[in-house]
Amino acid sequence: MVITASRKEILEQRGVVKLSAQTNKWRKGDIHMGIIFHEETKTFHLTNGEISYIMTVLPNGHLGNLYYGKAIRDREDFSHLLELVQRPMFQYIYDDDRLFSLESVKQELPVYGTTDYRAPMVEVLQPNGSRISDFVYVSHEVNAGKPKLESLPATYTENDDEAETLIITLKDSLTGIKARMLYTIWSDRPVIAKSVEYVNEGTEAVHLTTAYSMCLDLPDPDYQWMQLSGAWARERHIITRDLEQGVQSIGSNRGNSSHEHNPFIALKRETTDENQGEAIGISLIYSGNFKIQAEVDTRNTARILAGINPDTLDWKLEAGEHFQTPEAVVVYSDQGLGKMSQTFHRLYQKRLARGEWRDKPRPILINNWEATYFDFTRDKLIAIAEKAKECGVELFVLDDGWFGARTTDHAGLGDWVANPDRLPDGIIGIADDIEKVGLKFGLWFEPEMTNKDSDLYREHPDWILSVPGRHDSHGRFQYVLDFSRKEVVDRIYEMMAKILSTARVSYVKWDMNRSITECYSAALPADRQGEAFHRYILGVYDLYERLTSTFPHVLFESCASGGGRFDPGILYYAPQGWTSDDTDAVERIKIQYGTSMCYPISSMGRHVSVVPNHQTRRETPLRTRANVAYFGTFGYELDLNRLTPQEIEEVKAQVRFMKEYREIIQYGTFYRLASPFDQDECGWMVVSEDRKTAIVAWFRILYTPNNHFTRMKLHGLDPDALYSCSVIGGQALTVSMTPDGRRIYESVDGAEDQALVPVLEGPACYGDELMNLGLITSDTSAGEITGEDNPCGDYDSRLYILKAE
């Protein structure tokens, strides 16, 4: 296939040349790129000029890891990198060899109980009760492009020149189990994607009780482990600690990836910051129970495992059956956490998210939930929509409460038919009404749930996950449907498809408001109950795939009580997700900063809500609420009819601003400038692809009087370009100075009906100055009233718009 011009340009800028039209091999200087195999030494070298991943077949036939990191020159023999030493208390493989022990070897598919005492990547429980396996190299193949994973989300290619995939087959001869290990390397990204397919070619069934997606054995533990953790309403806070001897891990056993831990970690050197130093990012494309674990042994090597949580997995693999693990994505950066994040952003934006909405600017929406909760009528909804239309909003979303007997959270889930008392003309009618107002119409669903007070449950009480004879736990008075059963998924699909095919629905918000308990499926035999959690997630993916394929024009936004399932697996189906149920601007700063470690701006749902905020009771300026929410898909979650005329004018200005800059914000290059986890200020910026426009956000959490001078060093600009700088609070203003030093503020466009927020506009500066000296963010408050209308205080914020002249 023909490589795209843009990809050619990218590769040529890096000095990369394709060797011939008939091969997928490349060269950068004298470094050959692609997947290289040295037959004599049985060594594999995956390289693209940015990274190298080197493996070899070990003396016992297992697959060993020799190197992962910045690209190095290829050679025939890397065997000197295999460290074999005699140590006290080692156990050895061969009678006449006191050097080769798996206890000290870095491996690709480590197993249990054969001289390696570290955690295994796979455990196979056999009919005789043994868990011992011996996966030996059989063969390999190299394919252009990237194969699709069966029934699972994964990254993809659009043409074969983008990547190469190595498939190495290992086999345990006693059981007949094959492990097909998949490694994909991109031509222009420092990325390796890894997964494993297990095939039972034996004659007896076995049980996979551990089946991680990847193992990465590192030669030293001199890294800091970074995780994104928290709870409901404070998801993905950054937690960092040193790796040390022993085991540390994050994971979920809740049935979703969870608010508590995101399926992502980063390993960084102690001196690594946003812009320099080594960092390795590991992200699991999965939405269910997971575990990512680091184990440092007595020889100071570090083993990283990532995949399905083995605590809740017991998969029966019959003869002739196969099992595919989720995909793990590994990113390497030698330019700090910023480069690591940008790599994830571009990959997930362009080669994980799919469909018509992947590259489109996202509509500015208003959601009625915090405006009405369950207390709404058709007329109340129309009034909210009409005011939103006046402000320039594009999409109205009807949230929970429109269906069945749903007037509280005690009833109605599972009955996806409009409540005639609230919506006399049904969803068709309210959708038409909203369209007549001039807005697109969106609708909330919670497909995976039911209430016991529902027609669905009364008809099929055995359709929930529930243990016979045991009490059923509830969350929000609701119960989890057994999505491991095809007939359950079929029924929900039929109800949703009927609405989407008859009503003018342009957007769907898919929610999940509780975790799974009593995970037992009435449709599975006793020896397959350990499959229920994973089969449940496969059912979720199946429903998503059917709906997004049948209704490609519909924009799907995922949600799970906010960010409880904000993960790459769902991003494959829904290009944006509700980042958190916490809409407080101050709390969202940390949540969104942490989320940006892995996820692109275009994936983050962010709304302006009312004050006092419904989650924190905090009051923040309207401009700050907007300045935080701009950096995502943007919308409102309040009743605009309750705002003052001045606030409405400010909202109009916010909507105009977002429409002008949303493509840059959602699809530009994102840089973190100052961390809210380290100080009471935060900064980030987005730069357009041509580097002619940049939008910089600065936030203050708590104000300090008579504060020191502050600057933020910017990134990604053209060092030779001269940038004008406009500072926006609610709208842009210009500033002039009188002879006695007083400032005069004037509206940029002179519109009297806009909210005037006093700000400063700095002089034009060259890109190199802004990147090396920084943008001055000091305020002028002396800690006393001066008569000048200069914004200062808690929860302040500014936007700086830089444009190359």
Tell me the role of every PLM-derived stretch.
Residues 37, 42-45, 63-295, 311, ...:
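Polysaccharide-binding surfaces and accessory modules of carbohydrate-active proteins
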Residues 123, 130-137, 315-334, 794-802:
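Short Pro-Gly-centered flexible turn/kink motifs
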Residues 703-805:
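C-terminal beta-sandwich/jelly-roll accessory domains of carbohydrate-active enzymes
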Residues 265, 274, 676-719:
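Carbohydrate-binding surface patches
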Residues 394-402, 492-525:
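Active-site groove signature of glycoside hydrolases
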Residues 451, 456-490, 534-641:
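Glycan-recognition surfaces
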Residues 357-494, 507:
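Aromatic-lined carbohydrate-binding/catalytic grooves of carbohydrate-active enzymes
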Residues 50, 196, 320, 366, ...:
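Conserved, mostly hydrophobic/aromatic
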